[in-house]
Structure formats: structure tokens, C-alpha cells
């Protein structure tokens, strides 16, 4: 399978200004840029995945690249070479270091599509805590689940202003991920 195309200048301009969800657009474009520079992949022993922990300095330069795991030494080598030869990136959207993990797929089938941004302005749901958990010593007290925080109207308006229009490709990728996750396609 041929390598996907690299993000365009327009894609990077959007990614350089999108601050929601830990700079989701920047992280996606970074992965696309790396994969596009890795070249064509054919089915065989060299295909695989590699997961990195990445730190990008506020000016867009790579500060740290650490391999978390890999299924192919060739895929890791190609990904590292691509990272070393990346063109200059725009500054991070927040003006702070951007730290994230990314899995690069060097396989003959597409496994990563564009992200969907439509729910990015909704507050994150509260973390589930078992209300019946008990340490066996203290008195048993049922804890109330935390309430979801509401975004103030001004923050919601600012967030909605940043959202791009969702593309058909993003919706198809989201649907494909859901199908693979829940086994709808079997």
C-alpha cells in the first residue's frame, strides 16, 4: 500500500491553532507526516506497528522521542528515520510543550483515519468510581457519583468557534473504528 499523503499547509495551519483535546489536530498531523515519509508497505515480515512517546517543544521542534513498543524493527527504523527528516513544524497550539503517545501503523491496510472533532466541546464524562467499594475497615458509606461539569457559555462559544467542519472521511473513519471495536463487521 502506498504511503498516505502528507498533511497540507492548510492542515498544519489548522493544527497549529486547534487547542482542544490536547491539540488533537496537531497530534494527528504529526502521525500522518511520519507515516507519509515511511514509504510504501507490502505485506510481509517488515510490516508492523510502533508506539512512541513524543515531546514537542513549544517552537515545534522535537524534544524527545521514546519507543514504548514495536512489532517490527523495520517499522521502528523507518519511523525514526522519518521523524529525523521531518520538515519544520509549526509551534504548538498552546505555546507549551506537547506530550503525547502515538501508534504508527506500517501495514498494507489503512488503520488510521482523520479524527472527528464534533464532540470536542462537550465536557469529559466523570470518571466512574464504584459507589459500593469498601476497604473492609471503615464504616460503609455509599458515595455519590460526581456530576458532569458544565462549560460556561463563553468557553463553549470559544470552543465551538475552533471546530472545523467534519469531513466525510472523518465520519467514515469513526464508523470503521466503532465497527472494529464492537465487531459489527463480522
PLM segments and residue spans:
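Terminal low-complexity, intrinsically disordered regions
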Residues: 126-186
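N-terminal targeting leaders
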Residues: 70, 74, 119, 123-128
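Acidic/histidine-rich, surface-exposed loop or edge segments in extracytoplasmic proteins
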Residues: 7-20, 61-64
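Short proline/glycine- and basic residue-enriched helix-capping loop/turn segments at helix->loop/beta transitions
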Residues: 20-52, 80-118, 122
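Short tight loops/turns at secondary-structure junctions
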Residues: 45-71, 83
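A sequence-level signature for low-complexity, intrinsically disordered linkers and tails enriched
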Residues: 1-6
Amino acid at each position: 500500500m502506498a504511503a498516505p499523503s502528507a498533511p497540507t499547509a492548510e492542515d498544519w495551519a489548522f493544527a497549529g491553532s486547534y487547542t482542544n483535546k490536547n491539540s488533537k489536530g496537531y497530534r494527528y498531523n504529526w502521525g500522518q507526516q511520519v507515516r507519509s515519509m515511511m514509504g510504501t508497505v507490502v505485506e510481509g515480515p517488515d510490516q508492523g506497528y510502533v508506539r512512541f512517546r513524543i515531546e514537542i517543544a513549544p517552537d515545534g521542534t522535537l524534544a524527545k522521542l521514546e519507543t514504548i513498543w514495536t512489532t517490527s524493527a523495520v517499522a521502528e527504523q523507518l519511523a525514526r528515520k522519518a521523524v529525523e527528516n521531518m520538515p519544520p513544524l509549526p509551534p504548538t497550539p498552546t505555546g507549551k510543550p506537547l506530550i503525547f503517545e502515538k501508534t504508527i501503523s506500517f501495514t498494507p491496510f489503512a488503520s488510521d483515519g482523520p479524527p472527528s472533532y464534533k464532540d470536542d466541546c462537550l465536557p469529559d464524562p466523570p470518571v466512574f468510581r464504584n459507589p459500593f467499594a469498601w476497604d473492609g475497615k471503615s464504616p460503609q458509606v455509599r458515595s455519590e457519583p460526581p456530576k458532569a461539569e458544565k462549560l460556561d457559555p463563553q468557553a463553549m462559544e470559544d470552543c465551538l468557534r475552533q471546530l472545523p467542519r467534519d469531513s466525510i472521511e472523518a465520519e467514515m473513519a469513526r464508523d470503521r473504528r466503532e465497527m472494529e471495536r464492537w465487531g459489527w463487521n463480522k
